[in-house]
């Protein structure tokens, strides 16, 4: 809902009627009116400026907001709601990834950053480096952004990528 899903989209995702989905969305925003105001503000700001920005200032142009076509304009509104949130998360994980990579090099470790998927970093680590790599991950991921809430870091380990999930 926070990303601007329509009643049709929610009804498809939850296998409920469109009317039930619309009521669900309406109840959500009645319960959390500040979220509705925040999202409406993102759309209004995007219409005024022609773009939205992440917390770190990266801009996403949204020409669809000025379209005469309802479907394109609706798409633009969802982009305006979604981009600042998911874009900020993408900015933060990229900063964290760079910080972790630099620390692994700086510490002279054999562990290597292998992959980033959404908000996850995958590191191949020798068992004897597990403790220091865990500490580096926690420090550098939490330090990637200074927000009013602390970033949470979960770690999993395994002998294969599957085991570590």
Model-derived segments and their meaning:
Residues 1-165:
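Conserved catalytic core of nucleotide polymerization and phosphodiester-bond processing enzymes
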């Amino acid at each position: 809902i926070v990303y601007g899903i329509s009643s049709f989209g929610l009804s498809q995702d939850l296998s409920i009627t469109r009317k039930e989905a619309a009521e669900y969305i309406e109840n959500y925003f009645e319960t959390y009116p500040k979220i509705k105001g925040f999202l409406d503000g993102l759309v209004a700001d995007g219409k005024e400026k022609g773009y939205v920005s992440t917390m770190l200032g990266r801009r996403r142009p949204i020409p669809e907001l000025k379209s005469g076509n309802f479907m394109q304009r609706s798409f633009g509104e969802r982009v305006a709601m979604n981009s600042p949130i998911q874009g900020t998360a993408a900015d933060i994980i990229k900063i964290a990834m760079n910080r972790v990579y630099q620390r692994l090099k700086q510490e002279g470790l054999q562990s290597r950053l292998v992959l980033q998927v959404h908000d996850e970093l995958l590191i191949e680590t020798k068992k004897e480096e597990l403790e220091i790599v865990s500490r580096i991950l926690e420090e550098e991921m939490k330090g990637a952004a200074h927000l009013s809430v602390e970033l949470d870091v979960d770690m999993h380990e395994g002998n294969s990528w599957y085991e570590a999930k």
